Design a protein with these regions (language model features):
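Beta-strand/loop substructures that line and gate deep hydrophobic ligand-binding cavities in soluble
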Residues: 79-130
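Hydrophobic ligand-binding cavity/cleft-lining segments
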Residues: 1-46
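Short, highly charged C-terminal tails/helix-capping segments
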Residues: 36-40, 130-139
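Short, surface-exposed coil-to-beta transition loops
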Residues: 5-7, 59-62, 83-88
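Hydrophobic-ligand-binding modules of eukaryotic lipid transfer/binding families
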Residues: 1-10, 94, 98, 134, ...
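Glycine-rich portal/gate segments that line the openings of hydrophobic small-molecule binding cavities
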Residues: 31, 40-82, 138-139
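Hydrophobic pocket/interface hotspot
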Residues: 19-29, 65, 76, 101-103, ...
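A short, structured loop/turn motif at beta-sheet edges
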Residues: 13-16, 66-71, 90-100
Length: 139
């Protein structure tokens, strides 16, 4: 049974269409990574429209967009990765160029891995929401 993780809900200062269009092309994600981020120096990213490959320390994580529901949901599944997982990005239109956004992650983690990583995964998902909220407020 997969472990389910869910981020907090954030309000992003963009329409659901604008936000959806950013995430619907995985090449956009590679351009969002800060070039001077020290913690990512030894990590490589390669993307096309539907696929993203992340390599670090001999570990490869490959993902593919498997479902797009225009302006409301994008589903991304792992492909040939050490851990099987699914990420769902949810976009809820609030009107007035505002979108309620949250992320869900379902991962095949054993009990020990869930205990070790569960809180870190939730914190990571919440950090993504916080970052998007801050960035949208500055634009």
């Amino acid at each position: 049974m997969p472990s389910h993780f869910k981020s907090k809900h954030g309000v992003i200062g963009r329409s659901n269409m604008e936000l959806f269009m950013v995430f619907t092309d995985l090449r956009n994600l590679t351009s969002m990574i800060p070039a001077n981020e020290k913690s990512l120096e030894k990590v490589s990213f390669d993307a096309d429209f539907d696929n993203l490959r992340i390599s670090a320390n001999g570990i490869n994580i490959n993902v593919r967009i498997t479902e797009r529901v225009p302006y409301s949901k994008i589903v991304v599944d792992s492909v040939d990765s050490p851990i099987k997982f699914t990420v769902t990005l949810n976009f809820l239109d609030m009107g007035g160029h505002r979108t309620e956004f949250f992320i869900e992650l379902d991962a095949e983690l054993n009990f020990l891995m869930k205990q070790m990583l569960g809180k870190k995964i939730e914190n990571g998902l919440d950090t993504i929401i916080d970052t998007l909220e801050k960035q949208s407020a500055q634009i």
